[in-house]
Amino acid sequence: MLSSNDQKLEKLDSFYRPPVSKQRTSAEIISEARNALRTVRTQRPFTPREDQRKLFGPASSRSPENRPPSSFSLHASSFELSDSKPISGTRLRPLELKPKAPASPGTEDACLSFPKAPLDPAKIRKISGARARFYRAASQGMLLPDRSPPAAHSKTVDESSKPVSVGSSTARRNGTHLTASSATGQLKSPPLLTCDQGFQETTEQEVSLLSQLRRGGDPGKRRARASSCPSSSDLSRKETRAASRASSQEQETDTEVDEVFWKARIVPILHELENEEDIEEMCAACTQLHRTLEEARMLGKKFKRRTVLLKALYKLVDADSDPLSLKLAKLILALKVSGKNLLNVCKLIFKISRNEKNDTLMQEDNILESLLEVLRAEELQSNTEAFLYCMGALKFVSGSPGFLTEMVNKGAVEILAQLIKEMTEDTEKHGVCLPDSGHLLVQTTATLRNLVDSPLTRSKLLNMGAFPHLCTVMEQHADDKDICTNIARIFSKLTSYRDCCAALASYSRCYALFLSLLNKYQKNQDLVIRIVFILGNLTAKSNQARELFSRETGSVETLLTLFQSFYHHKENSPKLQLSEAKPQAEAEDVLVKLTRVLANIAIHPRIGPVLAANPRVVGLLLRTLESKSLGDCEELVINTIAAINNLSFYQVKSSVLQHRKLYVAELLLRLLVSNNMERILEAVRVFGNLSQDHDVCNFLMQKNVHKFMITLLEAKHQDICFSACGVLLNLTVDKEKRAILKEGGGIKKLVDCLRDFGPSDWQLACLVCKTLWNFSENITNASECFGDDVANTLLILLSTFLDEELALNGSFDQDLESYHRLHWETEFKPVAQQLLQRIQSHHSLLEPLPVPSF
């Protein structure tokens, strides 16, 4: 006789899925999500690597005549000297009230000469040799003097060739007295380039004074001179003029120091470049020149001899050597050229970067820093074309793994993001795009697309809040397919990561933007597939994204229109040869991504029932299953079944699937006869939802599906065992069908699942206990119901698993441990306790006596 507690247990109904209207705990929601609703994953669309490095690849929407060229010729004559004039830092002297008499020819300026007139073109044509031609032309008056003297044009400056007098405290150079504490003997130095068509010898005194003169003479005197200047409020007009003259004299001294440094240190290197024939030696000389100028702080625009130096560097471009040109370009950029020269040097680097073999060369020369400095320091509006080729070079090298980390560490992400922000703000301000800004944005977004492979890039973009700016670019340039495709590729990569996906999902304007682009580019597979992939990522990870997307007008209709269009394209295309099958495969890939979005948004409790009641949605999904053979487009079939599975979860009267449930079950039967376990798993999941209906259960019994479910319990695959057990649970709700568990050793296989997966999967353990509970509803003897061995095994397993210390003594991290405890306490424990009590109350440890023989 059963106790009162046992009688109460016996009155419990069979386990089945609770009605949707019943309030559920969080554990039940998680469990149901595993049973019926789940998001669908898919691969990111493949972007093939372009064979050639060009500004715009073969897939570009720009016609060749409407885009900047990737191939061009570049020579020394392409550069301009007008840009090379240095910025003067000299302060003008106050005007003297009394006129001064003209200086005599013997005064300090007598050594200077006026600039010579340009050479006769006929003479220039007679000069042969690239480098020799430059240096002869440079020495015949092309090197501009510091000041304009009254002397004759062709007169050689005598004072410039005189040695510094030994023992004198003053060294006279070009008519200017330079202070020096001492000077020692005279030794030969490398020849110097002078303004009278030749090189001259330099004395050691000139070289020995450099270090002191570069510091401005005697430090004590400089400090005394500086400290002796009174405040401006106390100066009389006379004192002001005196102070101004003192400052001017100091600047003149610095100028003369630069002149000595130029002749002693720079000209010898230029002389070497003139006479050297070996490219490696010329590269070494360029490196030495760059280092020397950097040490002397002569880089930038204020160097007086900058014009002469730049002209020398421009001439060397004709050597047509990538290693040499790269070093020249780096030095020219360091001299802060602008205008056409900046454009040409960026073109020069772009030209070099087109050859992938030069990547190592560019990395060794650290050209990245120079390119990024152009983008960081120069003005965008006046240098858009230069930025274009600069960014093109960065795009090429950013695709090389060796440059990725270096570019990110050097601030490339911040520079690109700021550039994008600046262009979007200018467009918003003026209402029109800057000239060539579209071309520049193509290169910028393509570069950023390569950089987002770095985790540090993703972190920086999140911290900068760059996603809205990228969306704004797509809005402003919606007619530019190249820009939209690049940004779609960026978001395709970023939304594959949870934090980036959440950031974009929270930007509510993105959904209307994506839908607008889908409607605009319906026939452009390359763009459509990426936007749909992004929407699939957003709706897979965020219920808010499902809600926001579904609220947009025409959201579902847009998906269905695309689905129907690409479905017809796929179905109406004849069977193609392997080489011609690419468009057909791309159409299938779009359908894969579209079914994924439908499956994901169906998880939302408000959207799911609406989709299930939409005949067009269900019709397209079923038509896909009808037309696909088992060997055709594996992923599309699986995603379609997953979408049907999520829709079949909603047991509402308006559901089209509920009205066609038997037809759906028949379609799914053929998927069970497959070697693909993923297909089988998806089909079994749908049966788990459909088998809640009595008619479907009868259909499954007629087709012996229950036997297949019992066989699947041996799969040793948790998800397959879970889904198969769910179908058996629904079948055993009917008392007449409970005996099926005895077929094929079903009871023992269920107990084996409990033993194998229980400690790691309390949801599966709960499902097994529910199925055994249904099976044993009319139990009178545990041994007769389960068998002696199975009953004893059940008693041991249930007793062990109900011991909290033993059951939850797993090596899990804190979050996973909390998850396991939640399911153990709320799902497994209540059912297991009931089942254990039932077995114990109907189980005797006494062995029956043998029947005596007479």
Curated annotation (Swiss-Prot):
Alphabetic keyword roster: Differentiation, Repeat, Spermatogenesis
Compositional bias ranges of the Low complexity kind: 58-73
ARM repeats: 255-294, 298-337, 356-396, 401-442, 455-496, 499-540, 544-583, 585-605, 606-649, 651-692, 694-733, 735-777
The keyword Repeat belongs to this UniProt entry's keyword annotation: yes
Region of interest called Disordered, as start-end residue ranges on this chain: 1-116, 140-194, 206-255
Keyword Hydrolase carried by entry: no
Compositional bias per record (Polar residues), positions renumbered to this chain: 74-87, 162-187
Disruption phenotype: Male mice are infertile, while female fertility is not affected. Spermatozoa exhibit multiple morphologic abnormalities including short, thick, and/or coiled flagella, whereas sperm heads conserve an overall typical hooked shape.
An individual GO BP term: cell morphogenesis
Known role: Required for sperm flagellum axoneme organization and function. Involved in axonemal central pair complex assembly and/or stability.
Protein name, as recorded: Armadillo repeat-containing protein 2
Annotated gene: Armc2
